[in-house]
Amino acid sequence: MSDGTAAMGKKGRKRVHIRCRRCGRHSFHRRKGYCAACGFGRSKRLRSYNWVRKKKNRT
């Protein structure tokens, strides 16, 4: 009788993300096997999107 609702709260104690080998940030997901910051393990190219950078104010 220990696999019920009370045991579900004890699942979040392990480290989900570890340090990435490519970018060095603490964003490499251990179970998924790729970095959330740079995309290492998922693609050869560096993960970058335009919505991450702040847009220039051209008025």
Curated annotation (Swiss-Prot):
This is Large ribosomal subunit protein eL37. Its cofactor is Zn(2+). Belongs to the eukaryotic ribosomal protein eL37 family. Keywords: Metal-binding, Ribonucleoprotein, Ribosomal protein, RNA-binding, rRNA-binding, Zinc, Zinc-finger. HAMAP family: Ribosomal_eL37. One of its GO terms (biological process) is translation. A zinc finger (C4-type) spans 20-38. Zn(2+) binds at C20, C23, C35, C38. The lineage of its organism: Archaea, Methanobacteriati, Methanobacteriota, Archaeoglobi, Archaeoglobales. One of its GO terms (molecular function) is structural constituent of ribosome. InterPro entries: Ribosomal_eL37 (IPR001569), Ribosomal_eL37/eL43 (IPR011331), Ribosomal_eL37_CS (IPR018267), Ribosomal_zn-bd (IPR011332). Pfam families: Ribosomal_L37e. It comes from Archaeoglobus fulgidus (strain ATCC 49558 / DSM 4304 / JCM 9628 / NBRC 100126 / VC-16). GO terms for cellular component: ribonucleoprotein complex; ribosome. The gene is rpl37e. Binds 1 zinc ion per subunit. Binds to the 23S rRNA.
